[in-house]
């Protein structure tokens, strides 16, 4: 039997997934069923684009529900040790690109809750992999899609 994948995430990240799951099960699922019902009332299903669209959305919603249930069931909550001065999951790390770049900050989270637009990067990302286990004032070479860059860690919280 294959071992289930573990999804490291913060408590906040798990709560967001639980909220999304609840919304899909209680609201979205009902909306899609209603769309299917209305589309069926149009008659012939063989050329009914509304019906096809609603069935596709239903498949997507059910797939997302299954994915979320799996992620929540296999979540491993990252405990913040509070005092660590080492970059790790759940930590926010600030760094500057050397020699004279601007400061950037990211929170390193599990892949399930990564959202670069919110400043949350996956622990599997090249930047996070380069920073994990490092300390303030360390200079680190980071692999990016645009090539290598040298950064200096200025803060971990």
From Swiss-Prot:
UniProt-listed GO biological process terms: DNA-templated transcription elongation; regulation of DNA-templated transcription elongation
InterPro entries registered for this protein in UniProt: GreA/GreB_C_sf (IPR036953), TF_GreA/GreB_CS (IPR018151), Tscrpt_elong_fac_GreA (IPR006359), Tscrpt_elong_fac_GreA/B (IPR028624), Tscrpt_elong_fac_GreA/B_C (IPR001437), Tscrpt_elong_fac_GreA/B_fam (IPR023459), Tscrpt_elong_fac_GreA/B_N (IPR022691), Tscrpt_elong_fac_GreA/B_N_sf (IPR036805)
PROSITE patterns, per the entry: GREAB_1 (PS00829), GREAB_2 (PS00830)
GO terms of molecular function: DNA binding; RNA polymerase binding
Keywords: Coiled coil, DNA-binding, Transcription, Transcription regulation
Signal peptide boundaries: none
Coiled coil (residue ranges): 10-76
Superkingdom of this protein's organism: Bacteria
SUPFAM superfamilies for the chain: FKBP-like, GreA transcript cleavage protein, N-terminal domain
Function noted in UniProt: Necessary for efficient RNA polymerase transcription elongation past template-encoded arresting sites. The arresting sites in DNA have the property of trapping a certain fraction of elongating RNA polymerases that pass through, resulting in locked ternary complexes. Cleavage of the nascent transcript by cleavage factors such as GreA or GreB allows the resumption of elongation from the new 3'terminus. GreA releases sequences of 2 to 3 nucleotides.
Family: Belongs to the GreA/GreB family.
Protein name: Transcription elongation factor GreA
Lineage: Bacteria, Bacillati, Bacillota, Bacilli, Bacillales
